[in-house]
């Protein structure tokens, strides 16, 4: 400000380059493909809308899976009574109302989180759990490429899987070991990709 030089807000400047702290996944999913196809900037509001819809669908699927796993019957009225405030309290309505550059990584991280939890829960009651675990962990790992702080939701894996893998010693069986690898592998792959990206830039 003192010298009158132009600068960008809320970014880091290091050795002649600007850096943002948000993950790169929104760029890879929306901005870059749209730019390559049209030569124009991607409308951020559309991306936020897509992420919001994905979140609502995901939270609905997650609640349905949770209800089926823990309760025999849940009325539609009770389901909606729980779903509506859950969506309202998630912050998604605020993100939809203000679809800015800041909103998209957060909305996308929330969407990947609920779908990741859904896949994990589905895997717990499936004979072919490895595929569900793989999909769930991929979603949860991709959260880091959107909004890194949301990786804390991955800690829910401990209460979800501790009994099966540790208490019941499923981890020490060939099938359990394969499933456990499917839970961990996506994190390793996504982490390697993010580290390579950071090194390249």
Protein language model regions, located:
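Juxtamembrane membrane-water interface segments immediately following transmembrane helices
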Residues: 1-12, 18-22, 177-201
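Juxtamembrane segments of multi-pass membrane glycosylation machinery
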Residues: 8-50, 68-73, 95-99
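Transmembrane-helix signature of polytopic, membrane-embedded enzymes
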Residues: 59-91, 111, 126-135
């Amino acid at each position: 400000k003192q010298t009158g030089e132009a600068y960008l807000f809320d970014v880091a400047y290091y050795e002649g380059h600007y850096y943002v702290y948000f993950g790169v996944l929104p760029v890879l999913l929306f901005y870059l493909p749209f730019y390559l196809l049209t030569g124009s900037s991607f409308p951020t509001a559309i991306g936020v809308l897509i992420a919001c819809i994905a979140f609502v669908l995901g939270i609905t699927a997650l609640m349905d899976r949770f209800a089926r796993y823990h309760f025999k019957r849940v009325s539609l009225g009770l389901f909606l009574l729980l779903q509506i405030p859950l969506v309202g309290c998630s912050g998604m309505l605020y993100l939809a109302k203000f679809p800015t550059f800041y909103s998209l990584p957060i909305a996308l991280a929330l969407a990947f989180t609920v779908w990741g939890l859904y896949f994990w829960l589905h895997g717990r009651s499936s004979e072919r759990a490895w595929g569900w675990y793989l999909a769930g962990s991929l979603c949860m790992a991709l959260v880091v490429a959107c909004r890194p702080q949301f990786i804390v939701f991955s800690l829910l894996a401990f209460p979800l899987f501790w009994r099966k893998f540790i208490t019941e010693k499923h981890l020490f069986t060939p099938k359990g070991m394969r499933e456990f690898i499917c839970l961990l592998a996506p994190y390793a792959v996504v982490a390697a990709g993010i580290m390579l990206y950071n090194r390249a830039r």
